[in-house]
From Swiss-Prot:
The active site is at D8 (nucleophile). This is Putative phosphatase YxeH. Pfam families: Hydrolase_3. The gene is yxeH. Keywords: Hydrolase, Magnesium, Metal-binding.
Length: 270
């Protein structure tokens, strides 16, 4: 019996209209009623998750969320931070210099805001702010507080340009950080120990749940570590090839209530 289900949001929990369908909502409630811990595990900031936590009633005592691709693990009932891994100002300045060298826009977060140092604001930065409902600000790098804590920096660009950028990142920079492509136009840069897999593992240990009792559901590159670590890794039908290959089970797409199908097949039917 699975005791913890960690679920990615965009492309997994949510359909392409950024909605939780009734079928998915009912399956989550049924699993929770059976005592299964439901944890949203997303690249989004907390502000971009909260309305879904409220909608799904994942804000009760003992409920948790994993945000910023594993850089933050937080109790949603008390807001107590279980784990937080951040980049600092020196990381920001070096990554900004790299973005200029590679000719790619970038943006970054603090605990509650999204910032861009690019005066010509990228359409993908605007999209990120809109989808996550996080306030967007233009901020020159030399105006950023030196004590800032940054959950993640993102290089953003058209998919073909971003692919070129990714292959051009120097090896020493790659080795210094966790880097994941979370969407065709998003490349995320985090603390070296931050990943969805590490965050799910840490939370399972905190809750006394064995690896074999954990199911993880996802679709994109930032989900790969948790899909590989889980006792049962579930790939959406719309997942990238690497996730499909790593998964133990393939469910339907995010527009076909895939999360509900996986829960019915692997949890509620047992």
């Amino acid at each position: 019996m699975y005791k913890l289900i960690a679920i990615d949001m965009d492309g997994t929990l949510l359909n392409d209209h950024h909605e939780v369908t009734e079928e998915v909502r009912d399956a989550l409630h049924a699993a929770k009623a059976e005592g299964v811990k439901i944890v949203l595990c997303t690249g989004r900031p907390i502000g971009g998750v909260q309305r879904y936590l409220d909608e799904l009633n994942l804000i009760e005592e003992g409920d948790y969320v994993i945000a910023y691709n594993g850089a933050l693990v937080q109790n949603t009932h008390t807001n107590e931070v279980v784990s937080e891994l951040s980049l600092g100002y020196d990381d920001l300045t070096s990554l900004y210099d790299l973005s200029l060298e590679l000719k790619t826009p970038m943006h970054f977060f603090d605990s509650s805001n999204l910032y861009t140092p690019n005066r010509d604001i990228s359409e993908f930065t605007v999209y990120e702010s809109y989808v996550t409902q996080v306030p967007l600000h233009f901020r020159k790098i030399d105006e950023v507080p030196k004590d800032i804590l940054i959950p993640k920096v993102m290089f953003i660009d058209k998919p073909e340009n971003l692919s070129r950028v990714i292959t051009s990142i120097p090896k020493d920079v790659r080795e210094k950080y966790t880097m994941v492509r979370s969407a065709p136009f998003f490349y995320e840069i985090l603390h070296s120990e931050a990943s969805k897999g590490n965050a799910v593992r840490q939370l399972a240990q905190l809750l006394g749940i064995e690896q074999a009792e954990v199911m993880c559901i996802g679709d994109n590159g930032n989900d790969l570590t948790m899909i590989e670590w889980a006792g049962c890794g579930v790939a959406m039908a719309n997942a990238i090839p690497e996730v499909l290959e790593a998964a133990n089970f393939q469910t339907r797409s995010n527009n076909e209530h895939g999360v509900a199908h996986a829960i019915h097949e692997l949890v509620l039917a047992k």
